[in-house]
Amino acid sequence: MSRTVSKLVINNLDLYYGEFHALKDVNLDIEEKEITAFIGPSGCGKSTLLKSINRMNDLVKNCKITGDITLEGEDVYRQLDINQLRKKVGMVFQKPNPFPMSIYDNVAFGPRTHGIHSKAELDDIVERSLKQAALWDEVKDRLHKSALGMSGGQQQRLCIARALAIEPDVLLMDEPTSALDPISTAKIEELVIQLKKNYTIVIVTHNMQQAVRISDKTAFFLMGEVVEYNKTSQLFSLPQDERTENYITGRFG
């Protein structure tokens, strides 16, 4: 019988922006090679937690964090420097944000930053990453054209390829399909499910149907708290907290 392994452990995490208590005693075990969805109304702390995992909140003035986030047993705030962490944890944002450079250079950007400059090695990384992002066949003949000429859906898959190029352990996705049309959304969802074979994925989504379609576990956030965390099928079919039931049935949110 296979045993699940916690890749990320969030323990007694509190986060303040000045006097505002944005995350309240959050405790989550995020398991390896699973898709974990964060759902909840706007402003409930989903994206704040995502940004805490890869320390994007380091740049926010008056942000104070207590508690622990560990990645494979290492504290991301006390034991990993920011460059180590960013190599282990990739991030894909809500709006596609390709760099104003070629498709090739977008994907090669991270590996170059981490010291890889061999053309042969970069060629292999770019091809592998674009294939993983289901984009290679669409762009292999125009790798040196600007990424800004791609469609929105292609740009988002390019951003996924760029994140994968550094071979992270964890991929964080902050509403990656909210700016896309339904066809592009379906492609991204299919891609995310495929990526689960090799990566631990955490996705923030406002689309509850999306959480049902792609995630193994779901955490429901409300006013900075994790109200409920369970297997997705159980959380949506038999919620244990009345607030979860009210949210997923559309009574608020």
UniProtKB/Swiss-Prot annotation:
Compartment annotation: Cell membrane
Pfam short name (any one): ABC_tran
Entry-linked Gene3D superfamilies: P-loop containing nucleotide triphosphate hydrolases
This enzyme's EC code(s): 7.3.2.1
Catalytic reactions of this protein: phosphate(out) + ATP + H2O = ADP + 2 phosphate(in) + H(+)
Alphabetical UniProt keywords: ATP-binding, Cell membrane, Membrane, Nucleotide-binding, Phosphate transport, Translocase, Transport
Alphabetical list of CDD domains matching this protein: ABC_PstB_phosphate_transporter
Binding site for ATP: 40-47
InterPro entries for this protein: AAA+_ATPase, ABC_transporter-like_ATP-bd, ABC_transporter-like_CS, P-loop_NTPase, PstB-like
PANTHER family (UniProt xref): ABC TRANSPORTER I FAMILY MEMBER 17 (PTHR43423:SF1)
Protein name, as recorded: Phosphate import ATP-binding protein PstB 3
Organism whose genome encodes this protein: Streptococcus agalactiae serotype V (strain ATCC BAA-611 / 2603 V/R)
Lineage of producing organism: Bacteria, Bacillati, Bacillota, Bacilli, Lactobacillales
